Amino acid sequence: MGSIGSMGKPIEGFLVAAIQFPVPIVNSRKDIDHNIESIIRTLHATKAGYPGVELIIFPEYSTQGLNTAKWLSEEFLLDVPGKETELYAKACKEAKVYGVFSIMERNPDSNKNPYNTAIIIDPQGKIILKYRKLFPWNPIEPWYPGDLGMPVCEGPGGSKLAVCICHDGMIPELAREAAYKGCNVYIRISGYSTQVNDQWILTNRSNAWHNLMYTVSVNLAGYDNVFYYFGEGQICNFDGTTLVQGHRNPWEIVTGEIYPKMADNARLSWGLENNIYNLGHRGYVAKPGGEHDAGLTYIKDLAAGKYKLPWEDHMKIKDGSIYGYPTTGGRFGK
C-alpha cells in the first residue's frame, strides 16, 4: 500500500525511501566528493525523518553526474569496491539501512570503456549486490555492456531485490530475468530527461504486472543547463497499479510500504494472469503440465547468437558516431 507520510516500519514488509536527487553539475573531482558527502548527509537525514525506513535508494548518476565531456576520464571514474563505496558502506552501517548507489566504474581492462554500475549495501556495511548495466542507452551512453548478469539478493522484510539501471527498465526480458531468479522487488535507478517520461511510468507498471513483483523506481530531478530530469519516483504494486507517484521536485523523498509476502502469495495462488508461470506452461488445462517450449523465434535466435531483425540491414544508427563515439571497439576518452 502507499505511504501517507509513514515514518514507522510496517508490521510486515518494509518502508522504502527513493530520493529524487538533484541532477549534479560536475566539472571536477571535488564536485564528485561533494556529491558523495551530500548523498551520505541525505541518507542520514532521511533515516532521522523516517525512523522506520529500511531501504534508501539514490538515482543513476547521483555520484558522478552526467558531464559527457569528462565522464570517461580517469579523474571521474571510481572502483567498486573502492574508498568511495567504503564511505557509503560506513553510512549504511551507521544508519542501519540498506542503500542503493550509482557508480561509473573503472573497467579492470584499461583498453575497454567503463561500466555503469549499481550496488546494494546492507545495514552491516557489506556490498551484497553489484550490477553492471546490461543495456546502456544507445547511442548516447559509452558504457561497456555489463557482464554480471542480473543478480538477486536478500533484502528487508522478506524481499528479494534486484536492480536495473535506467534504459534496462525498457527491456522487458530483463525484468523477467530478475523475477525468474526470485526477485519480488525490482529497483530501477535512472538519469532520464523528459523525452521518455511517459514511457518511464508505463514500463515501471508493466514490469511489475508481467512478473507479479513490486517495482521501486527513482530518477534524477532538475535542470543541468542542457536537459530537465523529471524525478517522478514511482512505487508500483505487483498487480501493475501505481501505489505512490512522485512529482518533478528535486529533493522530493518518495516513500511507500512494501509487502513482499503479498507478491509471493500471488505467485503461488493466482491462476488467471499468472503469466510468469504461464510462459513456460502454456495450455496446461488441455495438456498436463502445459507446453514448456514457448516456440518464440527471437528467444531461440538470441540464445544461439543469431538475433537479427528483418530491417536491421537498413537501420540508420548502429554506433555512437552521432554523439562523438565512432565505435571501433577501443577505449574512448583516455
UniProtKB/Swiss-Prot annotation:
GO molecular function annotations of the record: formamidase activity; N-carbamoylputrescine amidase activity
List of catalytic residues: E60, K133, C166
Q: Which reaction does it catalyse?
A: formamide + H2O = formate + NH4(+)
Query: What are the UniProt keywords, alphabetically?
Result: Hydrolase
User: What Pfam families does this protein's entry cite?
Assistant: CN_hydrolase (PF00795)
Which superkingdom heads the taxonomic lineage of this protein's source? Answer: Bacteria
Which enzyme type, at the first EC level? hydrolase
Q: Name one GO biological process term.
A: putrescine biosynthetic process from arginine
Whether Heme counts among this entry's keywords is no
What are the CN hydrolase domain coordinates in residue numbering? 14-260
Q: What is its EC number?
A: 3.5.1.49
Hey, which family's this protein in?
Belongs to the carbon-nitrogen hydrolase superfamily. Aliphatic amidase family.
Name the job this protein performs: Is an aliphatic amidase with a restricted substrate specificity, as it only hydrolyzes formamide.
Instruction: Report what the protein is called.
Output: Formamidase
